[in-house]
């Protein structure tokens, strides 16, 4: 009986399956196949609002590859970018704006469309194959609340990956012109996970001596050696130190003094000394004129109101005179050595004694920097350090600067109130008043990762380049910080084209030979030029993945080695992208010898051509010509290999020709 039931049941199931199967093949079926859709993009902003009226472009990777072949030429003699360079230095926006048109292609040929009220646009004619594109969003001309770029404009995607689906793209919002600064304390109140920024050197640059504010944490910089100790320079004030300013000639007309912390010997002329001390809890510098003892200013004492730098390469000291802040003509180099054959690599070095107005070379007497008020820290430097920077010239010709008020900030020595006198959240995200009033949630705030890559790089480049500013200190010419004619910093989200036009002068955009560049006109010699280097790399312009500073650096934390690297500098950070490179095999192929597994990518591709403090105080090697080859302390961000073949009689560097190089490369020809 059971067998009969089983057979009947099995037959019934089989019959039902056949019926369903045949029904699916019937021409009278009521079922509808899933309809295919063309590649569709939906644009929203960081608050989740859909964006209508924006144009979405599919930029062929081949065009970005093509623009990358065009040089970003910088005239080494003038520091001016050529007209042609300014048409190819923004890899996506120069294509979209028609500044560069690859042969047989260009913006007129791109698949594009305008988003509707639902934020969607169909790129109906986009080939859905292996061809790759960067998806770029340009808000409507009337849309002042959003910035161009988008979350899919950094890495190329295939047309096939966009087929038969709606692809989400997110763009950044931006503040209105009336937004105001509120200080990082307000930001961290909601975004507590980013409090790690307190440990970065961006936050530690300006400090009341040994009195970090509640927005500063020096714990990363309290090592046992001087070059790891943020307070190493101030410690020398406490034990007492005398710095001798001298020349090896009879006189000086340039103020280019040599310095030692012990009396110099030999045929020298000592002009003056700075006696460093700490008295009554105050750090002091006494100026004593040795050359002209009758100088009425000899013996003057200035208190150190603020330190400037520290923790890595150097530290300077600032004092208050009247209503302005001035830099004392002294720099501490924690890696320096008084036995160095290079006068710029000693423990203490003079800092612009004459140009800042501290010394009269004609009469060999002290002057006061108030004779050059236009070179005060307030107008010359603070623009790249203060959050919410503002400066004005008063009736006495003094330049008085302020930062955004913040109860946890640094004590301003002139105003007597606490301000955020260092780089903070709003330096890169823009003023936060509207964002805060709207309850956050991505409204009225610049989100760097959703900008075009060139605009994100500009957030750093605004200070990490070396040009002349469009803004001037009254009638006295341009200043060090690249300010506009209103003496304001570039607003986050600004394009490179607008920055060059509005913040750099018509006579100089960037570094030049003798002031920032080595004689090859390419490699950086001075600090804060990392962006000058980086825009020349394949990382910045290529047809695969457009990198920014934040691709390697963690902007919110000190990183693994104090340089805010996102990973270790032992090769793992490089190999996280260059996954197919076997380092030892690569080195062998390039150099013809096995370099060993301990060799680092950065030893060849990020050589320390530039100097901020002392760099290496002793030469790594001396060439056959007798030229000393030193190593700096700032890595070249061109990421190329500085070749020995680039050396000439007029260009002894930039190769930081250390013993590391010399272990395989001879000094012949140097």
Identify the residue ranges that each predicted region occupies.
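Bacterial Sec-dependent N-terminal signal peptides
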Residues: 2, 9, 14-43, 48, ...
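Extracellular beta-sheet/turn segments enriched in Thr/Pro/Gly and aliphatic residues
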Residues: 32-33, 152-178
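Structural motif
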Residues: 40-53, 59-64
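Short, acidic Ser/Thr/Gly-rich low-complexity loop/linker segments typical of extracellular
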Residues: 64-126
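A short, solvent-exposed beta-strand micro-motif common in secreted/extracellular proteins
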Residues: 117, 123-124, 128-145
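Local sequence-structure signature of Cys/Sec-based thiol-disulfide redox active-site neighborhoods
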Residues: 175-189, 655-658
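Primarily the internal scaffold of c-type cytochrome electron-transfer domains
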Residues: 194-290, 301-307, 316, 346-350, ...
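Surface-exposed recognition patches
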Residues: 321-419, 425-430
């Amino acid at each position: 009986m059971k067998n009969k039931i089983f057979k009947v049941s099995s037959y019934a199931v089989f019959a039902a399956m056949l019926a369903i199967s045949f029904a699916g093949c019937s021409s009278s079926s009521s079922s509808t196949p899933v309809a295919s859709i063309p590649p569709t993009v939906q644009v929203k902003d960081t608050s989740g609002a859909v964006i209508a009226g924006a144009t979405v472009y599919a930029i062929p990777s081949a065009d970005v590859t093509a623009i990358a072949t065009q040089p970003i030429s910088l005239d080494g003699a003038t520091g001016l970018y050529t007209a042609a360079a300014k048409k190819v230095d923004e890899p996506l926006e120069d294509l979209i704006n028609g500044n560069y048109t690859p042969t047989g292609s260009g913006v007129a040929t791109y698949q594009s469309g305008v988003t509707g009220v639902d934020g969607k646009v169909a790129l109906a004619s986009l080939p859905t194959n292996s061809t790759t594109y960067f998806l770029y969003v340009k808000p409507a001309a009337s849309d002042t609340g959003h910035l161009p770029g988008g979350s899919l404009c950094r890495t190329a995607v295939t047309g096939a990956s966009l087929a038969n689906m709606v692809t989400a793209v997110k763009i950044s919002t931006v503040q209105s012109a009336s937004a105001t600064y509120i200080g990082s304390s307000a930001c961290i109140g909601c975004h507590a996970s980013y409090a790690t920024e307190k440990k970065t050197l961006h936050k530690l640059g300006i400090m009341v001596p040994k009195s970090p504010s509640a927005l500063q944490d020096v714990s990363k910089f309290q090592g046992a050696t001087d070059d790891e100790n943020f307070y190493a320079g101030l410690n020398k004030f406490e034990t007492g130190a005398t710095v001798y300013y001298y020349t090896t000639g009879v006189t000086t007309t340039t103020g280019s003094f040599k310095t030692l912390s012990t009396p110099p010997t030999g045929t020298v002329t000592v002009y003056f000394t700075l006696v460093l001390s700490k008295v009554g809890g105050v750090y002091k510098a006494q100026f004593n004129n040795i050359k002209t003892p009758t100088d009425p200013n000899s013996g003057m004492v200035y208190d150190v109101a603020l330190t400037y730098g520290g923790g890595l390469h150097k530290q300077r000291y600032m004092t208050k005179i009247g209503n302005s802040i001035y830099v004392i003509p002294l720099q501490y180099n924690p890696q320096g050595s008084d036995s160095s054959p290079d006068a710029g690599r000693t423990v203490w070095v003079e800092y612009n004694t004459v140009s800042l107005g501290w010394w009269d070379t004609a009469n060999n007497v002290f002057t006061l920097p108030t004779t050059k008020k236009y070179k005060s820290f307030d107008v010359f430097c603070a623009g790249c350090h203060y959050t919410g920077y503002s400066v004005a010239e008063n009736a006495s010709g003094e330049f008085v600067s302020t930062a955004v008020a913040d109860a946890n900030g640094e004590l301003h020595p002139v105003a007597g109130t606490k301000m955020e006198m260092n780089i903070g959240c709003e330096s890169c995200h823009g003023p936060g008043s509207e964002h805060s009033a709207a309850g956050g949630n991505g409204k009225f705030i610049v989100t760097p990762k959703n900008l075009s890559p060139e605009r994100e790089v500009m957030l750093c480049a605004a200070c990490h380049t070396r040009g002349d500013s469009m803004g001037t200190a009254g009638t006295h010419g341009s200043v060090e910080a690249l300010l506009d004619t209103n003496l304001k910093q570039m607003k986050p989200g600004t394009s490179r084209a607008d920055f060059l036009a509005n913040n750099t002068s018509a006579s100089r955009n960037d570094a030049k030979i003798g002031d920032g560049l080595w004689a090859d006109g390419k490699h950086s010699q001075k600090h804060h030029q990392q962006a000058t280097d980086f825009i020349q790399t394949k990382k910045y312009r290529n047809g695969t993945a457009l990198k920014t500073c934040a691709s390697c650096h963690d902007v919110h934390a000190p990183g693994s080695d104090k340089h805010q690297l996102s990973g270790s500098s032992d090769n793992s950070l490089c190999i996280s992208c260059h996954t197919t490179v076997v380092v030892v095999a690569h080195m062998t192929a390039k150099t013809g010898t096995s370099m060993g597994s301990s060799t680092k990518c950065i030893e060849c591709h990020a050589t320390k051509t530039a100097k901020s403090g002392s760099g290496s105080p002793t030469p790594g090697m001396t060439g056959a010509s007798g030229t000393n080859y030193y190593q700096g302390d700032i890595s070249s961000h061109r990421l190329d290999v500085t070749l020995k073949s680039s050396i000439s009689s007029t260009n002894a560097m930039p190769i930081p020709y250390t013993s590391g190089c010399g272990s395989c490369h001879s000094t012949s020809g140097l």
